[in-house]
Swiss-Prot record:
GO terms for biological process: dTMP biosynthetic process; dTTP biosynthetic process; methylation. It is an enzyme of class 2 (transferase). This is Thymidylate synthase. Its EC number is 2.1.1.45.
Length: 283
């Protein structure tokens, strides 16, 4: 929690104002942020200086694991995070490849589970990683990437957190996640939960021990209409200790994650937080 607040304070103190063409808003911006999450000690990196809706964050990433491309499927899991980008993004609404209401296109999990090859076949990146790690194999290329520049025009949004690299040291699994852009008041709240949970889940289904998760952000920013709430409200609050994440031990395979797992299979223990803060969201 402290490293999150330190990043927020750094943006407030050192950030440079940049115009964002997509949203039409200014962003207070810093370049390069490195966060580390201790999955080995189960120190769940959830924000405590305001209420964090952790279930939606996990539900969203579960949708990525399943390769979903429709906002309705994410809503069924418990995440409404794709409603706006699928249905209110004017550039996407005008795109002739859009299939209709709630269609997201070839974004995130679609690339992770069905990356297109020139011959028309697809690559299941996640399946390969799970199979390798389960056999104790780390070929130094256990990489799940959602970033496919050749298909940017086939989706409603370029991936922000776009790549996840798994590494094995003995029987301990590590994760390094890369993010090109981060809305720190809103997006990082979700992203840090997702990085931690992804490592914990992958360790569980491959029979490994979770180690550290390393989260690398390039462009970290606070939108101009979020700044007052961050500087004058959230940064004035004292954080609470980190809670723990409990995952149903019956989750043992990738197929489990693809089929029957729901939010009922996750629980956060010992979570204390301050009152919610409603930050504006930029589409």
């Amino acid at each position: 929690m402290r490293q999150y607040l330190d990043l927020c304070q750094r943006i407030v103190d050192e950030g440079v104002w940049l115009e964002n063409q997509r949203t039409g808003k200014r962003c207070l911006t810093v370049i390069n942020a490195d966060l580390t999450y201790n999955a080995a000690a189960n120190e769940f990196p959830i924000i405590t200086t305001r209420k964090s809706y952790w279930k939606a964050a996990i539900a969203e990433f579960l949708g990525y694991i399943r390769g979903y491309d429709n906002a309705a499927d994410f809503r069924k899991l418990g995440a409404k995070t794709w409603d706006a980008n699928a249905n209110e993004n004017q550039a996407w609404l005008n795109n002739p490849v859009r299939k209709g209401v709630d269609d997201m296109g070839r974004v995130y999990g679609v690339q992770g589970r069905a990356w297109r090859k020139p011959n028309g076949e697809t690559v299941d990146q996640l399946r390969k990683i799970v199979d390798d790690l389960s056999r104790g194999i780390d070929d130094r290329g256990e990489i799940l990437t959602f970033l496919n520049p050749g298909e940017f025009d086939l989706g409603c949004l370029r991936p922000c957190m776009y790549s996840h690299t798994f590494s094995l040291l003995g029987d301990t699994l590590y994760l390094t996640s890369y993010q090109r852009s981060c809305d720190v008041p809103l997006g990082l709240n979700f992203n840090q939960i997702q990085v931690f949970t992804f490592l914990a889940l992958m360790a569980q289904i491959t029979g490994k021990k979770p180690g550290q998760a390393y989260h690398k952000i390039v462009n970290a920013h606070i939108y101009e209409d979020q700044l007052d709430l961050m500087r004058d409200v959230q940064l004035k609050r004292r954080p609470f200790p980190s809670p723990r994440l409990e995952i149903n031990p019956d989750i043992k395979t990738l197929e489990d994650l693809e089929t029957w797992v729901t939010l009922d299979d996750f629980n956060v223990v010992g979570y204390e937080c301050h009152e919610p803060i409603k930050y504006p969201f930029s589409v």
